[in-house]
Amino acid sequence: MADDPSAADRNVEIWKIKKLIKSLEAARGNGTSMISLIIPPKDQISRVAKMLADEFGTASNIKSRVNRLSVLGAITSVQQRLKLYNKVPPNGLVVYCGTIVTEEGKEKKVNIDFEPFKPINTSLYLCDNKFHTEALTALLSDDSKFGFIVIDGSGALFGTLQGNTREVLHKFTVDLPKKHGRGGQSALRFARLRMEKRHNYVRKVAETAVQLFISGDKVNVAGLVLAGSADFKTELSQSDMFDQRLQSKVLKLVDISYGGENGFNQAIELSTEVLSNVKFIQEKKLIGRYFDEISQDTGKYCFGVEDTLKALEMGAVEILIVYENLDIMRYVLHCQGTEEEKILYLTPEQEKDKSHFTDKETGQEHELIESMPLLEWFANNYKKFGATLEIVTDKSQEGSQFVKGFGGIGGILRYRVDFQGMEYQGGDDEFFDLDDY
């Protein structure tokens, strides 16, 4: 995950788009004054400008005065945004403009335009009471998806792994006769029945695989991993009943000691090299490397907001690791009496304590200059500190441990740093303040 800085930057871009989608999906407006415009890479700005001029003419006929004015206002905003571009950027252009209604019931104008992190091959123009983000969501879900078939003597499980998400698509159990010494003339008949049931089982698995992993005549996964404890997986991979299109996608056969969901987890673990570009594995590796630094006590690690920010300021952080749902806010306050700026990092619990926002001596309230989630601030500023930012989930065991045990924020350092020996002036202040340093 960290070996390729461009991949890490791309992950930050993906996180930003996920965050944007979340806020756009939640936004609602009155009437149809919210415009979603997506221009694919090879389109012409002039064509879109003409289309908008035509739309402006059509919108002038809307009967409701309020709706007419807000739609015309939104179209004008989009036209203004387009004037900033001579041509469509290489990856296309996404524009959202309109008036939304906030939770307090106030109206607020939204104007967003950006080039996505990879080509968006969708053309879209919609006026509605909400923003349409389906094309952006599709852009994110284009990560490689891998199929897993876990097959043993007691049943089969079909699943997929995409990015950090694993999903069980289907599973069924089977009751196959065991080999036994019941004998005499019946031995051959028993063996024949066994082979027949086994054959039918493999056929059922092969047919189910086609239903799940082939859609519209095409294989819908980037690769397949066959896993199992007996030789069923080998039998399936070599069987004539197994669809040729799927056969060509088999990446690996994996021996596992369990069936079902435990087997699925084990199969993911054992296919690591094959799926090394899947984020789930990369995340485990990255946090594993972080834990190694800690267990070997190399001193090349930091955790918690305070130490991590100290290390960033020193330029010591090579990889900054942050949990995607980190709920710490960064506040920049202006102290009225001293005219100094103060920076606080507070959890939702600490935010409730209003004493953080007032002067201890005078009781005067500090002026709020800026507030934003700390992760968002990192996403905008990590390059200034020469670090790579990795945004992780708590879906893997390591990720969950990182969030619960280390607060979801830490870093792998370029060199050993002794945080104990770096006492701050005003060490009694429990909040880390960059200006004190």
Curated annotation (Swiss-Prot):
A GO MF label: peptidyl-tRNA hydrolase activity
Modification N-acetylalanine, positions: 2
This protein's record includes keyword Protein biosynthesis: yes
Function: Component of the eRF1-eRF3-GTP ternary complex, a ternary complex that mediates translation termination in response to the termination codons. The eRF1-eRF3-GTP complex binds to a stop codon in the ribosomal A-site. ETF1/ERF1 is responsible for stop codon recognition and inducing hydrolysis of peptidyl-tRNA. Following GTP hydrolysis, eRF3 (GSPT1/ERF3A or GSPT2/ERF3B) dissociates, permitting ETF1/eRF1 to accommodate fully in the A-site and mediate hydrolysis of peptidyl-tRNA.
NIKS motif (motif): residue ranges: 61-64
Name of the encoding gene: ETF1
Keywords from the UniProt entry: Acetylation, Cytoplasm, Hydroxylation, Isopeptide bond, Methylation, Nonsense-mediated mRNA decay, Phosphoprotein, Protein biosynthesis, Ubl conjugation
Cross-link (Glycyl lysine isopeptide (Lys-Gly) (interchain with G-Cter in ubiquitin)): 279
Name listed for the protein in its UniProt record: Eukaryotic peptide chain release factor subunit 1
Gene3D superfamilies in alphabetical order: 3.30.1330.30, eRF1 domain 1 (3.30.960.10), eRF1 domain 2 (3.30.420.60)
